[in-house]
Amino acid sequence: MIELPAQSIIDSDLYKFSQQAAVLEKYPDVDIEWRWANRDGTPFSNEAVDAIRGNIERMAELKVTNEQIMAFAKACPFFNPSYMAYLKNYRFNPKEVKITQDNDENFAMSIRGKWHSTILWEIPGLFIPSDAYYKIDDTNWSEEGQEALLREKGKFLWNCTFADFGTRRRRNFESQDRAVRILKDNPGFVGTSNVHLALKYGVKPIGTLAHDWIMAHQVLSGIRHCNRAAMQAWNDVYKGNLGIALPDTIGSDSFFADFDGVLSRLFDGTRHDSGCPYEYGEKTIAHYESLGINPCSKVIIFSDGLRANADASPERNPEKIRKYFEGRIKTSFGIGTDFTNDFPGSPALNIVVKPYTVNNIHVVKYPDSAGKAMGDPDAQRVVRYISRGISLDTPLASLKKGK
């Protein structure tokens, strides 16, 4: 048995807790199914899957201490006391998780239950498989040189505002701990998405909402205006706090159609997570200008596969993106895998956990990069038709090839 990679219940991203609190307040009776996806089809050995099963079971042993609750509440005063009381008593329920594997070493995982109960499984549902894979299946790598590599990344980002977003796909806990420890003294470092590490190092927990909040509103309020409904519900809970909107759940054009003058003024900015960052930035600036809003009063957080080195493509290069938009709109960068799973000769897993059904109705993610689409194919066609007017008869595969 390998060591449990989770350090505590709060060894997770802030957005899971902010969404859990919002779900408890707005939608406490909603049922959900989540599914784990292995985008590159990397096989997992029987031994690795057994280790994953064992550590999923051991998650039930975790609890939040009084000291952690007090520190968390102080760092994030937008949480109400009733949510902190809920979190203090929260325990993971491994019965909500189903793991299967076929003879070809195809590993699958699904999670079912109440939305508020299952929502915290997403992050350990990613880093537990990753930890097992790199301890058992892919062992051809070394920690040697990682500190020096991170220091070089920090130098490259010297003029950028950035945060660590590395929890979900980290190689192990040590890799993320090292990243925050080394990068926290960089002048542009603003915090980490990981609450446990934010409290440990006295930096700001970073995060607001993610795709699952908007995906669920496809069922709770309808597909066409799920973005608007999700943002309005979010503001009902947080009253202007945590004001970074996520535009690409069903495509950014659909989002901006819903991002009216009130919401555009209320939210501090948006997060780019798919499609060309330069095209998205131009679209965002034009949107604000059309509403008489100064784009320089808003921010775009870029977070799509960024790499902190000069060899990165223009679409993945934070420094090039920063320079391109300098003086036109504020920029910040959320960097994940490049901080916590960049090991020469040992590629990072490309894995994700997303909702599959809400109240037994399919939901999908169909963003600006079709390769990131998730969900039932027929449901994808429906969302694509409603949000973009594309015929239901158009094959999904042909669109992914750019046709």
Where are each of the predicted segments found?
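Glycine-rich phosphate/ribose-binding loops and adjacent secondary-structure elements
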Residues: I2-E3, Y201, I206-K403
